[in-house]
Amino acid sequence: MKALKIALTKGRLEKDAVALLEKAGIDCSSMNDKKRKLIFHSSTQPISFILVKAVDVMTYVKHGVADIGIVGKDVLMEASKSHYEMLDLEIGQCQFCLASTPDFDPSSYRRKIIATKYPAVSSKFFRAKGEDVEIIKIEGSVEIAPVLGLADAIIDIVETGSTLKENGLVIYEKMYPISARLIVNKASLKQNKTQIFQLIDQLEQAIKEEQTR
């Protein structure tokens, strides 16, 4: 049986994803002693894991290097769809928010400048509102953009809001809820349908058990 390759997002989401996979009966013990390794093989099941950056999960799945990926909905919303989105894993929950300094006026007709890591999501949001804005893409911490006068407001993902508060920002609008999703390579779903749907069934059961706690 061909081993399924699962691409996981490195960092905070990785921990939650591994915990959920283990609840679903997936052997993740090979990842206990990671050191600098990025590829792991289960010794008891035909499954391998690849640890990559969030944006690269989609790339590995798109090109068939990974059969399955676990990645935040924010990453999926920002990129073109080249995969099947199979399951909301209900981990890594946060939301897209519009935030700025307390003196920001979201109802102003003046053309606004918005700083964000997510230009596609931001453009879609303001287009739906019928607003013409200038989008500035920032790769690092966007919270300082309104404080330093680079932008009028920001759009970013927010979990607790503590980082915004620490930088003197307030939330003006909660836009879209975000959570981690299970994505599957289109060709892999055809070739490994039984294995993949068995994994999905196990994950769905683990999610249900978590909900009833």
From Swiss-Prot:
Top EC class for this record: transferase
A cellular component annotation (GO) from this entry: cytoplasm
Main location: cytoplasm
Pathway in which the depicted protein is active: Amino-acid biosynthesis; L-histidine biosynthesis; L-histidine from 5-phospho-alpha-D-ribose 1-diphosphate: step 1/9
EC numbers for this chain: 2.4.2.17
Subunit structure of this chain's protein: Heteromultimer composed of HisG and HisZ subunits.
Function in brief: Catalyzes the condensation of ATP and 5-phosphoribose 1-diphosphate to form N'-(5'-phosphoribosyl)-ATP (PR-ATP). Has a crucial role in the pathway because the rate of histidine biosynthesis seems to be controlled primarily by regulation of HisG enzymatic activity.
Similarity comment: Belongs to the ATP phosphoribosyltransferase family. Short subfamily.
Name under which the protein is recorded: ATP phosphoribosyltransferase
Organism the protein comes from: Listeria innocua serovar 6a (strain ATCC BAA-680 / CLIP 11262)
